[in-house]
A protein has these predicted regions:
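Nucleic-acid endonuclease domains
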Residues: 1-184
Length: 184
């Protein structure tokens, strides 16, 4: 089975986007410091409710068979009016810890597919590695990308998604775990 077929037919997007809704409506997550916990929870939800295996390696986040998948996600990635088939620029690689240029990143294959998820519009698109790398642009502190119609395959998620949220807030569970951890 191909990655796209699996994402379209064997992935429970109602639960994945339910996790997203729960995390972004969680009043206990209010600062940028919470972004890591949110991103990790979404990655783990994708792994639990799809055929992808979360590996969290440098340059890719999942595997699907022998294919490496890099995940990029964010709110409001696709334009709502200007061009609904185009994304705003978003960061794909960071220069902060490395002395690399955009050209270095264009030459370096680390994944087979980039999976881009717009958390607000509930859209999932797949970009092949070689094409993605050809679109890298220089940003303030890393390589950026901007996608247009023809740059990606958009997964058919079956129309309007009715979400199923987890029964508890993750921030509450984390706080209880920390309290228990410190109870010695």
């Amino acid at each position: 089975m191909h990655l796209i077929d699996s994402l379209e037919t064997r992935t429970d997007w109602s639960k994945i986007f339910g996790v997203v809704d729960s995390l972004y409506n969680d009043k206990g997550f209010s600062s940028n410091a919470d972004n890591f916990a949110r991103a990790t929870a979404v990655e783990k939800a994708i792994a639990k409710f799809s055929d992808l295996i979360r590996v969290d390696q440098t340059g890719y986040d999942f595997t699907f068979g022998d294919k490496k998948i890099e995940l990029k996600m964010g709110k409001n990635l696709f334009y709502k009016r200007k061009d609904i088939h185009a994304t705003k620029k978003f960061k794909v690689k960071s220069f902060l810890s490395e002395k690399k240029t955009v050209e270095d990143f264009r030459q370096s294959k680390t994944f087979d597919y980039m999976m881009v998820i717009d958390l607000t519009a509930r859209r999932v698109v797949i970009v092949e590695d070689e094409h993605a790398r050809s679109l890298y642009q220089t940003g303030a502190d890393g390589a950026m990308i901007e996608l247009k119609l023809g740059d990606y395959y958009e997964c058919d998620l079956g129309g309007i998604i009715t979400t199923t949220e987890p029964p508890t807030c993750l921030s509450d569970a984390i706080n209880k775990a920390i309290e228990g951890y410190l109870n010695f």
